Amino acid sequence: MSKVTVVGAGNVGATCANVLAFNEVADEVVMLDVKEGVSEGKAMDMMQTAQLLGFDTTIVGCTNDYAQTANSDVVVITSGIPRKPGMTREELIGVNAGIVKSVAENLLKYSPNAIIVVISNPMDTMTYLALKSLGLPKNRVIGMGGALDSSRFKYFLSQALGCNANEVEGMVIGGHGDTTMIPLARLATYKGQPVSTLLSEEKLNEVVASTMVGGATLTKLLGTSAWYAPGAAGAYVVESIIHNQKKMVPCSVMLEGEYGESDLCIGVPVILGKNGIEKIVELELNADEKAKFAASAAAVHKTNAALKEVGAL
């Protein structure tokens, strides 16, 4: 029997749990939240769609009862607060680091062999924190960001090409941030044909720019962070692990010399399977892409340094 726990029953966490159930990724999905009744209510609401949508997954909600998460195969951490007006980067990291660290430690008490998928922001730094503080093998701690950014990239490519997003292949590497992500336009294809031969350089640059501000654009429209695509991206990563699909998915993972970088979690393509990260795939980047990746890594290192400043590591 397979089991997934999603911590945080807010918009992203609830969407992730809902997609996991609808796609019957696991036999049981547990949602845990600190707010009394929220996860229980959302779980009940979702279960009342089972007959309508035709899924058999059981969804359980609980308030801070980590015992109910016991023996989870994968745990997804969405907990944390958004950055508030006037809040410094260090303050946000300090608050969310405390939350993520506590959540991860409690989860592992009951599911010592679980694979951890991190969605909480700043995602690359929270993934690094979870890995470092728990002392787990690097294959078991994975940040979701690249899967989401790549999905947005494919959406904007499909809009420019006038095709279905499923007909496009595209990948985003680097940090999960609007100035650190690197949409790899050179490698994007439509039905096997390089997109660079189908779109003008100007149009392709527009697609890249739209991808990089994709999250910010949605925040401006919604008045809050997006949740459908982030939640679905988390579920997509979990599905590849639980079903041992061996998909190549860009995720934030610990590098130890790959791409010329070490001691940080950052987005690169990996093969996902039952062991979590089965393999890190090293792409042949050109000089411009290598320079952008190095700059992205430097920015992530700088953010990670704040973990020590606030005493989280």
From Swiss-Prot:
GO terms assigned for molecular function: L-lactate dehydrogenase activity; L-malate dehydrogenase (NAD+) activity
Alphabetical list of CDD domains matching this protein: LDH-like_MDH
GO BP annotation list: lactate metabolic process; tricarboxylic acid cycle
Chain residues that bind NAD(+): G8, A9, G10, N11, V12, G13, D33, N96, I119, S120, N121
Binding site for substrate: R83, R89, N121, R152
Family recorded in the similarity comment: Belongs to the LDH/MDH superfamily. MDH type 3 family.
Entry function: Catalyzes the reversible oxidation of malate to oxaloacetate.
Name of the protein this chain belongs to: Malate dehydrogenase
Lineage summary: Bacteria, Pseudomonadati, Bacteroidota, Bacteroidia, Bacteroidales
